[in-house]
């Protein structure tokens, strides 16, 4: 059986005239922190279509360079795969383990740094302008419009891949320093056989 994939390219993307709408804020309770909320940014339906077209362009370029430590939002990888990797490395002799969560990662993404990393592998200025427009589209909630000078919306189609692009240098740096690492989006588990203090310092700087 032959399976065909139909890809719709919005005309505004071809003409370089597309301007995304602000995302809709949608708070959801944090499971492990009663009374605290995680703010999702839900794009309009048409913007989701445009983000999917962008994702289809970015994935083949960046997927081959993502580190083996990364498991979040990647085809063929799951939380179970990440847990199996952690367990295998624990059994191999890791004495020190840190369960780390990158605080407010999606809300604090540096746009300039992210665009610089994308530009290292994407020369098409239209793609770079599109990403910047999505990042700076802003958000709205409770009748107010909020600018977005930092961050990428949790809830956006392309945000997970952008997060992996931004964190790939971190994955590589941990490996170069001799630490084992498993990362799922902004949650990471670095491990080492010795030097507990240096491991903690490496994660927090």
Language model regions located:
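A short catalytic or substrate-binding loop motif that flags glycine-/basic-rich loops and adjacent residues
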Residues: 19-22, 31-34, 45-46
């Amino acid at each position: 059986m032959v399976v065909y994939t139909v890809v719709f390219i919005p005309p505004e993307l071809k003409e370089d005239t597309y301007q995304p709408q602000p995302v809709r804020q949608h708070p959801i309770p944090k499971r492990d922190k009663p009374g605290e909320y995680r703010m999702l940014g839900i794009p309009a339906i048409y913007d989701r279509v445009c983000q999917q077209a962008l994702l289809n362009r970015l994935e083949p370029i960046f997927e081959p360079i993502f580190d083996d430590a990364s498991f979040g939002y990647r085809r063929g990888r799951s939380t179970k795969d990440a847990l199996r990797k952690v367990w295998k490395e624990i059994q191999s002799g890791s004495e020190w383990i840190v369960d780390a969560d990158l605080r407010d990662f999606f809300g604090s993404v540096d746009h300039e740094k992210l665009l610089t990393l994308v530009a290292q592998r994407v020369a098409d200025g239209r793609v770079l302008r599109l990403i910047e427009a999505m990042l700076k589209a802003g958000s709205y909630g409770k009748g107010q419009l909020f600018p977005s000078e930092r961050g990428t919306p949790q809830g956006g189609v392309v945000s997970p891949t952008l997060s992996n692009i931004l964190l790939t240098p971190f994955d590589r740096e941990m490996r170069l320093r001799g630490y084992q690492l498993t990362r799922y989006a902004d949650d990471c588990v670095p491990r080492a056989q010795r030097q507990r203090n240096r491991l903690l310092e490496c994660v927090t700087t």
